[in-house]
């Protein structure tokens, strides 16, 4: 219902609605993660990943990623498959390389996170930039009228996520 409302309201205001499904979680665990608590799942780490038992990125969203595609087809709205795009990026980097996209920090590495973090859901600044760029390109392909506005800028942000310095 909310996706349909979003599309209707966007069209009423003269906008171009584009629907996305979810980005993937960095989850290489073939063990069945029977956990409907998103916060616990976000923090799921099996002893620093020594127990990884899959070389395949495992879906953690289930049917949730299908609904936006169905609504997009039903309402004739452009659709961006963020699940596939991010799955391809994560798998191209592999188990260890994909950490570079996420909030994986050792204790003391980032002042604002003194205890460190092993977060397989949220992107760090580098990961956010990579994913945002890929998704912006996908919007440009899905909606050529918007594609001419897609830009990729260089920018500098400190490890703490502070700063707003761009070069054109």
What does each of the following model-derived ranges do?
Residues 1-147, 168:
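Alpha-helical cap/lid subdomain in secreted, periplasmic
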């Amino acid at each position: 219902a909310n996706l349909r409302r979003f599309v209707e309201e966007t069209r009423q205001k003269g906008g171009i609605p584009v629907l996305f499904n979810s980005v993937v979680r960095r989850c290489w665990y073939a063990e069945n993660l029977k956990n409907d608590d998103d916060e616990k799942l976000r923090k799921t780490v099996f002893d620093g990943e020594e127990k990884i038992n899959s070389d395949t990125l495992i879906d953690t969203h289930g049917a949730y990623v299908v609904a936006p595609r169905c609504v997009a087809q039903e309402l004739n709205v452009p659709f961006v498959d963020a699940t596939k795009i991010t799955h391809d990026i994560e798998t191209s980097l592999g188990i260890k390389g994909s950490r570079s996209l996420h909030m994986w920090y050792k204790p003391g590495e980032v002042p604002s996170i003194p205890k460190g973090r092993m977060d397989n859901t949220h992107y760090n600044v580098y990961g956010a930039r990579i994913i945002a760029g890929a998704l912006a390109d996908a919007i440009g392909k899905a909606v050529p009228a918007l594609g001419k506005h897609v830009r990729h800028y260089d920018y500098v942000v400190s490890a703490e996520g502070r700063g707003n310095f761009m070069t054109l």
